[in-house]
UniProtKB/Swiss-Prot annotation:
Keyword rRNA processing: yes
Organism for this UniProt entry: Mus musculus
Subcellular location: Nucleus, Nucleolus
This protein's UniProt keywords: Chromatin regulator, Methyltransferase, Nucleus, Phosphoprotein, Repressor, rRNA processing, S-adenosyl-L-methionine, Transcription, Transcription regulation, Transferase
Gene this chain is encoded by: Rrp8
Full protein name: Ribosomal RNA-processing protein 8
UniProt lineage: Eukaryota, Metazoa, Chordata, Craniata, Vertebrata
Complex formation: Component of the eNoSC complex, composed of SIRT1, SUV39H1 and RRP8.
Record GO cellular component, one term: rDNA heterochromatin
Sequence ranges of Polar residues compositional bias: 51-61, 139-183
UniProt EC number: 2.1.1.-
Protein family according to the UniProt entry: Belongs to the methyltransferase superfamily. RRP8 family.
Biased composition annotated in UniProt, kind: Basic residues: 184-203
Length: 457
C-alpha cells in the first residue's frame, strides 16, 4: 500500500557491497582525498547506520532461506563496527553531506542490489565464481558512482579488525590465509615478492662490535703498511735533493759569471782554493750542453777522424778529456783543474809546450775570460806554420762575426771554413800563416765576446 523509502533498500545493498569488497581488496587503501569524496563517504556511512537500525526484509532474488539467515547473522556481527564508524565520522557532517549525496536512478540501484545480493559469500569461504561476481559488481558500481568505495572498504576492514580483538568467535584474517592467497593477482603477488626481496635487510638489527666477524686474523696475514717515519724520511730526502740541486744551480751561475768576467789567472786561483768548485761547475756545464741537439766536441772529433792520426793535437780547456777519448791522435789536454789523469793543470795563456810543436789547436767552448787575445797568441806560438786552429763557441756571444774574424786574422791566421748553421754554436777553422802582425799594445776590439750567462729557471 505504501512504498518503502529508497534508502531502506539501498542501505543493505551497500552494506553487502562493502562486505564483499572488504575481503577482496588489501588492507592498506589510499587515503580519501577531495571534498566531494569525503561528502560521499559520510553519506554512505549515514545510510548504513540508518539501515542497520531497522529490520531488513528479505529480497525476492535470494536462492534459499539459508542464505538469508547467513546474511542476517553476518550483518548482525558487523552492526557494532559500522555503528562506531558512523558515530565517529558522520556526526559532524551528516546534515551537510546529505544535501550533496549523488542521485542514482531506481532501475540502476535495483540492478546493483540484485547482483550484489546474489553474489554474497557464505561464511565458509569464497569460491572462484563468487569472486568473479564480486569483481563484476565492483566494476559496475564504479561506473555509476562518482567516488570509488575504497574508503568504505578500509573503514569496514578496520572496524572488523578492531572487533576481532573483542570478539574471539570471529575468524581473523590470518586464519583465512589459505584463501587470501587466491585473492591476489599474479602481478600483485610478483610485486609483493619483489618488495620482500628489496626490503630483506632493511629492518635487520645492527651488529654490535662483539657480534661482528673477526677481521684481525686477515689483517695480521697482510703485509704491514709502511711506517710513517719512512715516508717522512723519503719526503725529507726528496726535499733535500731539490734544495741541493737549487743550490748547485745557483753556485754554477756564480762560477760561470766569475770565469767570464775576469782574467784566466783569477779563475785559476779560484779553483786552486776550492777544487770542488771546478767539479760543480763542470757538472752544471755538462747539464746545460746535454740539452743541445749536437755537442760541439763530437763535431770536432768527427773532423779530426778524417785527418791523419799522426797529427798532434793541443786541447785548450779539455774538461773531462772527451776529445782525447774520441780520436786516435796524440792529444795534449790543458785546463784550470784536473778531472782526468791526462789533464795538465795550467793557465791556457801559458801552456808547457815547445814552439811550433803541434799540428792542431782546439778551443771548444773555452774562450772564457777577458784575455782571449792571450789564448790565441799562445795557440799561434805552439802551432806549426800551416797548422789548424779550430774554434767552437756559443752563437749568442758574437755581436759581429766579421769583426771577430778580422781580429783573428791579425794574430797570424786566415779563415778557411765556417759553419753558422747550428742554432747553439758556431764553428770556425783557421790556418796559421805566421806570427801576429800587430804589436802587443795594439787594440783588437773584435776579440771582445759577450759573456755566456745562464738565467735562473
Amino acid at each position: 500500500m505504501f512504498e518503502e523509502p529508497e534508502w531502506v533498500e539501498a542501505a543493505p545493498a551497500i552494506v553487502g557491497l562493502g562486505a564483499a569488497t572488504a575481503q577482496v581488496r588489501p588492507a592498506t587503501a589510499p587515503p580519501v582525498k577531495g571534498r566531494k569524496r569525503r561528502h560521499l563517504l559520510a553519506t554512505l556511512r549515514a545510510l548504513e547506520a540508518a539501515s542497520l537500525s531497522q529490520q531488513t526484509p528479505s529480497l525476492p532474488g535470494s536462492d534459499s532461506e539459508e542464505e538469508e539467515e547467513v546474511g542476517r547473522k553476518k550483518r548482525h556481527l558487523q552492526r557494532p563496527s559500522l555503528a562506531s564508524v558512523s558515530k565517529e565520522v558522520g556526526k559532524k557532517r551528516k546534515g551537510k553531506c546529505q544535501k550533496q549525496a549523488p542521485s542514482i536512478s531506481d532501475s540502476e540501484g535495483k540492478e546493483i542490489r540484485r547482483k550484489c545480493h546474489r553474489q554474497a559469500p557464505p561464511l565458509g569461504g569464497v569460491s572462484a565464481g563468487e569472486e568473479k561476481g564480486k569483481r563484476k559488481c565492483q566494476e559496475y558500481s564504479s561506473l555509476h558512482l562518482t567516488q570509488p568505495l575504497d574508503s568504505v572498504d578500509q573503514t569496514v576492514h578496520n572496524s572488523r579488525t578492531s572487533t576481532a580483538t573483542i570478539d574471539p568467535s570471529k575468524p581473523s584474517p590470518e586464519s583465512m590465509s589459505p584463501n587470501s592467497s587466491h585473492t591476489l593477482s599474479r602481478k600483485q603477488w610478483r610485486n609483493r615478492q619483489k618488495n620482500k626481496r628489496r626490503h630483506k635487510n632493511k629492518f635487520r638489527p645492527l651488529q654490535t662490535p662483539e657480534q661482528a666477524p673477526p677481521k684481525a686474523s686477515i689483517e695480521e696475514t697482510e703485509v704491514p703498511p709502511v711506517p710513517k717515519s719512512d715516508s717522512q724520511e723519503s719526503r725529507a730526502g726528496a726535499l733535500r735533493a731539490r734544495m741541493t740541486q737549487r743550490l748547485d744551480g745557483a753556485r754554477f751561475r756564480y762560477l760561470n759569471e766569475q770565469l767570464y768576467s775576469g782574467p784566466s789567472s783569477a779563475a785559476r786561483r779560484l779553483f786552486q782554493e776550492d777544487p770542488e768548485a771546478f767539479l760543480l761547475y763542470h757538472r752544471g756545464f755538462q747539464r746545460q750542453v746535454k740539452k743541445w741537439p749536437l755537442h760541439p766536441v763530437d763535431r770536432i772529433a768527427k773532423d779530426l777522424r778524417q785527418k791523419p792520426a799522426s797529427l798532434v793535437v793541443a786541447d785548450f780547456g779539455c774538461g773531462d778529456c772527451r776529445l782525447a777519448s774520441s780520436v786516435r791522435n796524440p792529444v795534449h789536454c790543458f785546463d784550470l783543474a784536473s778531472l782526468d789523469p791526462r789533464v795538465t793543470v795550467c793557465d791556457m795563456a801559458q801552456v808547457p809546450l815547445e814552439d811550433e810543436s803541434v799540428d792542431v789547436a782546439v778551443f771548444c767552448l773555452s774562450l772564457m775570460g777577458t784575455n782571449i787575445r792571450d789564448f790565441l797568441e799562445e795557440a799561434n806560438r805552439v802551432l806549426k806554420t800551416g797548422g789548424l786552429l779550430k774554434v767552437a763557441e756559443v752563437s749568442s756571444r758574437f755581436e759581429d762575426i766579421r769583426t771577430f774574424l778580422g781580429a783573428v786574422t791579425k794574430l797570424g791566421f786566415k779563415i778557411i771554413y765556417k759553419d753558422l748553421t747550428n742554432s747553439h754554436f758556431f764553428l770556425f777553422d783557421f790556418e796559421k800563416t805566421g806570427p801576429p802582425r800587430v804589436g802587443p799594445k795594439a787594440q783588437l776590439s773584435g776579440l771582445k765576446l759577450q759573456p755566456c750567462l745562464y738565467k735562473r729557471r
